[in-house]
């Protein structure tokens, strides 16, 4: 039997894993700093066949952390937990973004996401398979996934030129 704390953790993981991304007036996702995991959906959380976990934390979130050498390379690991008896497939994708500069005053940020064109490579560490960024996890299985997210030289230059003291990537 699960404890109240364990049930609370799983409820948060289910809600975060199944939230809907909120888009701004330009049709781009709001920054994670503004929307968190997105708009929670009780329907999605109750009906999902899988959810995400991250080792070492109770929430289903990844943090890219600081990149002091400005390499533009970020590594993330997470687990895909299959609650069902059936084999499931999920296509991995990434929406990378940073801050944009105000068009009326370059001294300020616009508080609007600047989407980044970049690349990522995914690999299975344990418990599943991957082909062309489609992850397969067996029924009632757990698949540990590692994603390496790399900014293009163009995006690194954009961030450097716009924010010489650095800026977040999410």
PLM regions: where:
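Beta-sheet-dominated interaction scaffolds and their linkers
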Residues: 42-85, 93, 132-135
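Short, hydrophobic/aromatic beta-strand segments
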Residues: 86-94, 103-105, 159-160
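Intrinsically disordered, low-complexity Pro/Gly/Ser/Thr-rich segments with frequent PxxP/GP/PP motifs
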Residues: 105-161
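Short, acidic/polar linear motifs in exposed loop/turn regions
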Residues: 82-86, 98, 153
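Short, solvent-exposed loop/turn segments enriched in Ser/Thr/Gly
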Residues: 70-77, 156-170
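Hydrolase catalytic cores
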Residues: 1-26, 169
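Structural signature of outer-membrane beta-barrel domains
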Residues: 20, 97-99
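A eukaryote-biased signal for short, well-structured alpha-helical docking elements
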Residues: 24-49
